[in-house]
From Swiss-Prot:
<keyword id="KW-0175">Coiled coil</keyword>
<keyword id="KW-1133">Transmembrane helix</keyword>
<feature type="coiled-coil region">
    <location>
        <begin position="9"/>
        <end position="31"/>
    </location>
</feature>
<protein>
    <recommendedName>
        <fullName>Single-pass membrane and coiled-coil domain-containing protein 4</fullName>
    </recommendedName>
</protein>
<feature type="transmembrane region" description="Helical">
    <location>
        <begin position="32"/>
        <end position="52"/>
    </location>
</feature>
<feature type="region of interest" description="Disordered">
    <location>
        <begin position="1"/>
        <end position="27"/>
    </location>
</feature>
<dbReference type="Pfam" id="PF15012">
    <property type="entry name" value="DUF4519"/>
</dbReference>
<keyword id="KW-0472">Membrane</keyword>
<comment type="similarity">
    <text>Belongs to the SMCO4 family.</text>
</comment>
<keyword id="KW-0812">Transmembrane</keyword>
<dbReference type="GO" id="GO:0016020">
    <property type="term" value="C:membrane"/>
</dbReference>
<dbReference type="InterPro" id="IPR027960">
    <property type="entry name" value="DUF4519"/>
</dbReference>
<feature type="compositionally biased region" description="Basic and acidic residues">
    <location>
        <begin position="9"/>
        <end position="27"/>
    </location>
</feature>
Length: 59
């Protein structure tokens, strides 16, 4: 039977498996890419605030 244009096709078990695998890969990338990048950005902000607000040394 022909597939109508407006109707989405039914998801097969193979499609479901591929989608599940893609979601796992996305979760893995979050822990390996996003979190370290976020940590570096936060560290840079902390260092900048520390340098900007430290008292000037008078000698």
């Amino acid at each position: 039977m022909r597939q109508l244009k407006g109707k989405p096709k039914k998801e097969t078990s193979r499609d479901k498996k591929e989608r599940k695998q893609a979601m796992q890969e996305a979760r893995r990338q979050i822990t390996t890419v996003v979190l370290p990048t976020l940590a570096v950005v936060v560290l840079l902000i902390v260092v900048f605030v520390y340098v900007a607000t430290r008292p000037a040394s008078t000698e």
